[in-house]
Amino acid sequence: MAAAARVSEVKAEGLLRGACTALAAAAALLVGLSTQTETVLLVRKKATVKDVQALWVLAMAAAAAAGYHLLQLLKCLYLGRVGGARPCRRSSRALAWTCLLLDKACAYTTFATTVAAAQACVVALDGAHALQWTKLCNIYTRFCEQVAGSLVLGMLAAVGTAVLSAASARNVFRHYASLETYAAH
């Protein structure tokens, strides 16, 4: 019974990791490949992701998160196939802790870079009158819409990664004895 429950947990984790992989990859591709060229005062200007450092960092962090989730998805597929062959308890505990720490780092990084890019986009959307920066989204509308879509996908990937880190924490604590075991002794 417990083995069947574990297999279903691995499948659920695999589905969520697949979704996070797709969301993070889509966010990275959408922001990384977004460009728009407009003529402003007889000068052709091209808006790219490299114009705003926070967007470039978002593209790289989302791509790294997608790669990490893909590797973890492959691990889930392997564990789903091998299911019965469990490694020794000590290496399993170390693997669980490693996955938890990596999941936490991925969640924090994805969330932080997405929020930083969103903050930079607010300046592009509203301008900064004290610094005499104009509203850029009035000029580069399509570029700003694509970046906004990337921010939504990045935030969904961050939320999914946070859920995965909670599942990883549950997996870590499963390797330790419960309080009832200590109370019985």
UniProtKB/Swiss-Prot annotation:
Cellular component GO terms, alphabetically?
A: plasma membrane
* Annotated Pfam families: CASP_dom
Q: Which domain of life is it from?
A: Eukaryota
TM ranges: 23-43, 54-74, 105-125, 147-167
Extracellular face residues: 44-53, 126-146
The protein's UniProt keywords, in alphabetical order, are:
Cell membrane, Membrane, Transmembrane, Transmembrane helix
Query: Topology in the membrane?
Result: Multi-pass membrane protein
Q: What is its main location?
A: membrane
Q: Where in the cell is it found?
A: Cell membrane
Q: Which InterPro entries did the record assign? A: CASP/CASPL, CASP_dom
> Which residue ranges are assigned to the Cytoplasmic compartment in the record's topology?
1-22, 75-104, 168-185
Q: Subunit notes for this chain?
A: Homodimer and heterodimers.
Family affiliation:
Belongs to the Casparian strip membrane proteins (CASP) family.
The protein's name in its UniProt record? CASP-like protein 2C2
Species, as recorded:
Zea mays
